[in-house]
Structure formats: structure tokens, C-alpha cells
Amino acid sequence: MKLYHHPLSGHAHRAHLFLSLLGVPYELVEVDLAAGAHKAPDFLKLNPFGQVPVLDDNGTVIADSSAILVYLARKYGRTDWLPEEAVAAARIQKWLSVAAGEIAYGPCAARLVTVFGADFRTDEVIARAHRILALVEAELGARRFLLGDNATIADIALYSYIANAPEGNVDTSAYQAVRAWLARIEALPGFVGFRRTKIGLAA
């Protein structure tokens, strides 16, 4: 099983983290984004969208971080990470949508400005980041994880860009429930961190 990734991609980190938490064998293949390797013909055969991550499971190719999380949970029968019960499954889908929406256009976008020089309005993306952080803070409340006492792929989908939000000049110090939640994820057996850059508030 190969995971095509880049160490500064939070989307790729989601897949890397979940593979490590599952404890299954895998090989990391770094894609040189700066050199445009993700737009090269060979890579576009794997993912026509030209994005990481991509999982190649002995010829079964899965692109998109959320799709990879779902695939791995189903492949290994890990109903603890992705419950089959209808309400829990729907709640997880909600958070996967948040990861692709509010997280992508909030803390992820804010970090893209500082780390990669992306052309976003800084004030707007930081404001979006704080809106979703406040929502996650309220949703967590006294819960250990997003759905309750145990981590699910919902937590994995949100972790990376929230953990590294300070790199995008997003101050997370006021979100105590979020910070405690991050620490719980980081304490899970098999945890692997998302590479940090000394930029923004993380400098």
C-alpha cells in the first residue's frame, strides 16, 4: 500500500495519520509539489485532479483525503473509527463535509497564505478560521472527541489544519476545549505529527 503525499499538506497528513493509527503497513511516496510533480502525466493517471493524497492499494487507487479515511476504515472493518449506526455515520459525514468546507476555507486557507504564498484575503480567511474554531469548541463541550468518548475519522479529518492553524496567524489560545482535544489525538497510540513550519504565530 502506497500513500502519495507531501509533508506540508494537511490533507495528506490526514491519510498518513490514519494509516499510522491503524497500524497497517504502508509506504510513503513524497510528491514534489514545488517541481510540479502532481501535474505530471504519470501522477495525473493516479489522480486527474492533480492533488495529494492518493492511496494505491495494490492497484486500487483512492484519491481525496476523506475518501481515503472512509476506504481504510471500511477495508479493515474498523467500525470504532467509522460506525455503521445511521446517526453516528451521519454525524461523521457532517464533519467530513466541514473538513472539505469550513476547515479548507478557514485555517487551511490561512496557512496557505503564509506557508505557500496563496492569494487569499488574510482577514477573511482568519475570520473564517475563528468561526469554525468557535463552532468546534462549542460542539466539543465536555466531550473527549467530536462524537463522544472515542476518536473517529471525524477527528482525524479536522485535526491537521486546526493543529497547525497558528502557522496561518490564527491564535488558538482561547479555545481550551479544542486544545485539549488536540492533545488527546496526539496521545493516541501510533500518532504521527503534521510537520510544523516556523511561520506566522508559530515562528
Curated annotation (Swiss-Prot):
Keyword Transferase annotated: yes
GO molecular function: transferase activity
Keyword Transferase in record: yes
Annotated Pfam families: GST_C_2, GST_N
Disulfide bonds: none
Entry coiled-coil feature ranges: none
Swiss-Prot/TrEMBL keywords: Transferase
Residues annotated as domain GST C-terminal: 85-203
Domain GST N-terminal intervals: 1-80
Family: Belongs to the GST superfamily.
Protein's UniProt name: Protein GstA
Species whose genome carries this gene: Rhizobium leguminosarum
Gene name per UniProt: gstA
